[in-house]
């Protein structure tokens, strides 16, 4: 009886999720190509609660050329993550516009836009399966050399090669059998496999030692100079 009650509650919640309507949708005739990695914030104001008067971002005017590398710093809660979330259109601006590749992000097909804007967060998700299975979320039908190259740039090869089964080593749900730094490096490699025009690293090397962090940043500058970072 207890299991039936729990199953019924779970089924109800699943149905609610399936019936949920997306707040962010593409236009009837969306753009299906991102020309380059240029990013423009034109007088952007953003609030999580529309009409509340509580502005997370106010009148942001920022222009980043394709292939340029910039860093955004600030205290906790100042809106850094909110700012980058607008680039991949996880939220819509309250006023102003965000452009990627010279076009307003609201004009793109969502899958097209998000395939070209790779985001690596401080805490990322690894799935049950092998190391290679997790990398394939970045590129499903890639060659083994491509997976190795991405891991080399992210300095993930340093620990993968020491695993008993290498790229066939098992990853527990959530990457429970890997350290924080190892998970971050795998997620960076996975993002690189998408070959994005924009790569956003949101405190994504916080669990990596200083020397490895420097190696990753140097490799990103050398190997993918055309990607906006």
Language-model regions, residue ranges each:
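Cytosolic ends of transmembrane helices, especially the final helix of ABC transmembrane type-1 domains
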Residues: 1-17
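Conserved E/DxxT/N motif and adjacent residues on the DHp alpha2 helix
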Residues: 16, 23, 136
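Flexible, glycine-biased helix-capping/connector loops in cytosolic signal-transduction modules
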Residues: 20-23, 165
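ABC-type nucleotide-binding domain
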Residues: 32-229
């Amino acid at each position: 009886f207890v299991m039936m009650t729990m199953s019924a509650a779970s089924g109800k919640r699943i149905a609610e999720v399936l019936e949920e309507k997306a707040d962010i949708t593409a236009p009837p005739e969306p753009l299906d190509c991102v020309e380059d990695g240029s990013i423009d914030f034109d007088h952007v104001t953003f609030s999580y609660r529309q009409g509340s008067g509580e502005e997370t971002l106010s009148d942001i005017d920022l222009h980043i050329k394709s292939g340029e590398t910039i860093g955004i710093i600030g205290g906790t809660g100042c809106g850094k993550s909110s700012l980058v979330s607008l680039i991949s259109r996880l939220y819509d601006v309250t006023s102003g516009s965000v452009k990627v590749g010279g076009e307003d992000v609201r004009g793109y097909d969502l899958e097209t836009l998000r395939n070209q804007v790779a985001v690596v967060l401080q805490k990322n998700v690894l799935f049950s399966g092998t190391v290679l299975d997790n990398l394939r979320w970045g590129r499903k039908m890639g060659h083994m050399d491509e997976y190795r190259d991405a891991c080399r740039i992210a300095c993930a090869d340093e620990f993968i090669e020491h695993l008993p089964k290498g790229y066939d080593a098992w990853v527990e749900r959530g990457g429970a059998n890997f350290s924080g730094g190892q998970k971050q490096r795998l997620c960076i490699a996975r993002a690189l496999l998408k070959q994005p025009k924009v790569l956003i690293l949101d405190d994504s090397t916080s669990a990596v030692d200083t020397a490895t962090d420097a190696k990753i940043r140097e490799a990103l500058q050398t190997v993918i100079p055309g990607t906006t970072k």
